[in-house]
Amino acid sequence: DLHSFPTRRSSDLHSRYVQTWSFAKRKGYSGTAVFSREEPLQVVRQIGSPVAEDEGRVCALEFTGYWFVNVYTPNSKNGLARLDERMLWDERYRSFLAELAKEKPVVSCGDFNVAHEEIDLRNPDTNHQNAGFSDQEREGFTRLLDAGFTDSFRKLYPDRADAYSWWSYRMRARERNVGWRIDYFLVSDDAAGRITGASILDDVYGSDHCPVELRIRL
């Protein structure tokens, strides 16, 4: 199984997993990590993006039969102040994954910082053009899927509403399940038929996100 654990401490898993980290230059700002049972063949931490390249936002590991990529997509910020940078990032990340997929199947997981469709957040009308639900970000995610990738959760549950992976700390949002689905497992289309399960572990606490899970035969 492949998992994304946003808040699990490395010491808890040290004895069982190989740890691969990608750090931001700015201490405490951002970063990604992958814990794997096997040593990767190679690790890629930069994607040639003109923005956010020193923020530890990608941790890509090559294994014998596939690429596994953990990503933390830049947030567009209040008022979409960082939207232009976000669009540059989305374009480069899409190209990066597409290049990897030419070699072997790709699994990409992480915080993509976008609710793709109205079903993916509780209040789409009042959040329209807010960061994470702007037309531009949603179109960018559509282009990523169109480049040859499958949203594993929606493949299995195309009509499931009220399934979220992030909740604001304000207004008892998690208790009321006023959330967003912004954490995904994407699978290259050539391997999408091997997906056997996808879950959102919303009973697991530790941050404003919860883990997401993919089961796939690779």
Where are these regions (language model features)?
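Short, small-residue-biased leader/transition segments that mark boundaries at the very start
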Residues: 2-10
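Internal alpha/beta domain cores that form substrate/cofactor-binding pockets in large enzymes
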Residues: 9-20
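Generic structural signal for well-ordered secondary structure
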Residues: 12, 25-28, 36, 52-54
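A generic structural signal for short beta-strands and their flanking turns/coil linkers
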Residues: 15, 29-31, 57
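A short linear hydrophobic-aromatic micro-motif
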Residues: 18-22, 197-199
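A short, structured active-site edge motif that brings together acidic residues
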Residues: 20-29, 47
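Short, charged, surface-exposed secondary-structure boundary motifs
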Residues: 27-33, 141-142
